[in-house]
Amino acid sequence: MKTIFLSVILLMCSAVSLSAAGLTGRDVMLKAKNRPDGDTRYATLTMTLIQKNGNRRERKLVSWAMDVGKDSKRVMFFTYPGDVKGTGFLTWDYDDAKREDDRWLYLPAMKKTRRISGKSSKTDYFMGSDFTYDDMSSRNVDEETHTLLREEMVGGQKCWVVQSVPNDKHEIYSKRITWIRQDCAMAVKAEYYDKLDKLHRSLTVSNISKVQGFWVMGHMEMTNVQTGHKTILQMSDQKFDLKIDAALFTVARLEKGI
């Protein structure tokens, strides 16, 4: 009985704390969305695909990004191994929640550019990984309805816990629970639930540090808990506010490669 009483008191205190702060779920997600990250960005990435039986496949990529007003553009090219080398992914993410983002995938083996749009961007997985094409882009905060649930400690850091429900019925998840670190406004954990409200995918983020004064993540791990497949993304050589030619973010350059 004492334990139950203590739990109730803690929940009440948490609710009072959140109310006093005046924060909403949308406020928290805006903090994460608007976290300073420079006008341009570069990184090298290592993507490791791990099957349930432990078999691993490794891929390497390079990524550039640029802000254009409130919109952002990003292009990624695979550099390893040979069977995916030259494959490119270009995204134009618009700040307007009513405007669909533009995404293109270039497949050099077929010499063909595929436009990723509509339901495909929500349900298809990026190059055999556990990240959807939508996950690889910058989501507008108002594409979901957010509720601030509580505060919680993760890895010794105080976090806001936010539930996000998508407005688009084509999304593969019914809700997402995200843990946002309060000191750096960065997501460190997320859980995606399917349409039956069962846990579908789980994301963890680690190796958080500062580069050029900006908070960065060095390690992301997305696990499909229903299939046992896992994808690890490791970021390195991250640079900010470097000079980048805007022509890099065009379909013509996507097809030309690096």
Where in this protein do the model-derived segments appear?
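Short acidic/glycine-enriched loop/turn segments that link adjacent beta-strands
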Residues: K70, G155-K158
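Boundary at the C-terminal end of the N-terminal hydrophobic targeting segment
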Residues: L18-G22
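Gly/Pro-enriched, hydrophobic low-complexity segments
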Residues: T79, L90, D102-Y106, R115-S117, ...
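A short, amphipathic edge element
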Residues: R26, R57, M136-L148, D197-S202
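Short amphipathic beta-strand and strand-loop transition segments with alternating hydrophobic
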Residues: V62-A65, T147-M153, S206-I208
